[in-house]
């Protein structure tokens, strides 16, 4: 069921992300993700433009003749599916490349919000954590890849592949964007992937709203060059206001597989 309060909060955190990238003290941590984002996006966009025509022809070959009168609508859905698959490729690559820098940005945003240091060793501590960060990105890829493959296989089914699959792909992409960017502040506190995923699922409308806005802005020229640090800043604010108090002191306690909340406590301290 759609939760209007979570819908508003998801929008709020996205908007606040734009506010924080301009704050003094954070700008130098924003520059590197923007530069990496620009180089990677330009390269993949060139590849996408050079291959889009062949990809569309390939997808349209699966549409039977008796659905020819719907070809224009089905073509639009096919293009949407291809765009989302392109987006998934982009976010996966950018996640691996920019993970250390995004983790550092999330750390600095949290320090600005709370006044507390997460790591005391500065750059040395970040370098030490790079293998763990890359392992975390691999964990996210293992979670998402089987679902992407399933959606890809479903796209071969006539009509279903051109109507239902694009919608499911978009929703899954929104969910993955929430996971991708919220994971940086969670991972800075070494909260496990499963606990993080369950916690976000407990406020699914908020997560999907935030992830949906990030997804849509990725397709807007110029804005898409800034969206990575914006999403990291907004996700960190979401962590601080919704999950930080309830999770960071309870990481060693058992959590419900359905809700991600501490099963030994009726009040987890999560701020609504």
Curated annotation (Swiss-Prot):
One MF term in the entry's GO annotations: high-affinity sulfate:proton symporter activity
Key word Membrane present: yes
Main localization (coarse): membrane
Compartments, as annotated in UniProt: Cell inner membrane
Domain of life: Bacteria
This protein's UniProt keywords: Amino-acid biosynthesis, Cell inner membrane, Cell membrane, Cysteine biosynthesis, Membrane, Sulfate transport, Transmembrane, Transmembrane helix, Transport
InterPro entries per the UniProt record, alphabetical: CysZ_sulfate_transptr, Sulfate_CysZ
GO biological process: cysteine biosynthetic process; sulfate assimilation
GO CC, one annotated term: plasma membrane
TM stretches of this protein: 29-49, 66-86, 148-168, 219-239
Coiled coil, from the record: none
Membrane topology: Multi-pass membrane protein
Family to which the UniProt record says this protein belongs: Belongs to the CysZ family.
Physiological role: High affinity, high specificity proton-dependent sulfate transporter, which mediates sulfate uptake. Provides the sulfur source for the cysteine synthesis pathway.
Name the UniProt record assigns to this protein: Sulfate transporter CysZ
Organism annotation: Haemophilus influenzae (strain PittEE)
